[in-house]
Curated annotation (Swiss-Prot):
Annotated segments matching region Disordered: 1-27
Organism in which the protein naturally occurs: Mycolicibacterium paratuberculosis (strain ATCC BAA-968 / K-10)
GO terms for biological process, alphabetical: protein catabolic process; proteolysis
PANTHER family in the cross-refs: ATP-DEPENDENT CLP PROTEASE ADAPTER PROTEIN CLPS, ATP-DEPENDENT CLP PROTEASE ADAPTER PROTEIN CLPS1, CHLOROPLASTIC
Biological classification of the source: Bacteria, Bacillati, Actinomycetota, Actinomycetes, Mycobacteriales
InterPro entries per UniProt: ClpS, ClpS_core, Ribosomal_bL12_C/ClpS-like
Name of the protein in question: ATP-dependent Clp protease adapter protein ClpS
Length: 105
């Protein structure tokens, strides 16, 4: 039988307190956004359809976002927690759209 002990904390370096530093509160509290990028493949009607189905947007709102993607090259389509934006990006990728996420500052 093998007995394993609990992991121990690493020893601190000289000149440090041994405590981990956390990110500033304002950075971790900032919302994240999902960005859809223009691509040469998907039809504008399809992009509008995807925005309606995935996000529940009305046709006018989905069309506005699609036109922003088409004319400006990108559009923010959702905002929220990092985990929620990871899910949104995955869904958009599954639908064949180019999407990324970034922290909104």
């Amino acid at each position: 039988m093998v007995v394993m002990s609990a992991p121990t904390e690493p020893k601190s370096r000289p000149g440090t307190t041994g405590q981990r530093e956390s990110a500033p509160e304002d950075v971790t509290a900032s919302p994240w956004v999902t960005i859809v990028w223009d691509d040469p493949v998907n039809l504008m009607t399809y992009v509008t359809y995807v925005f309606q189905k995935l996000f529940g947007y009305s046709e006018p709102h989905a069309t506005k976002l699609m036109l922003q993607v088409h004319n400006e090259g990108k559009a923010v389509v959702s905002a929220g927690s990092r985990e929620a934006m990871e899910v949104d990006v995955s869904k958009l990728h599954a639908a064949g759209l180019w999407a990324t996420m970034q922290q909104d500052r």
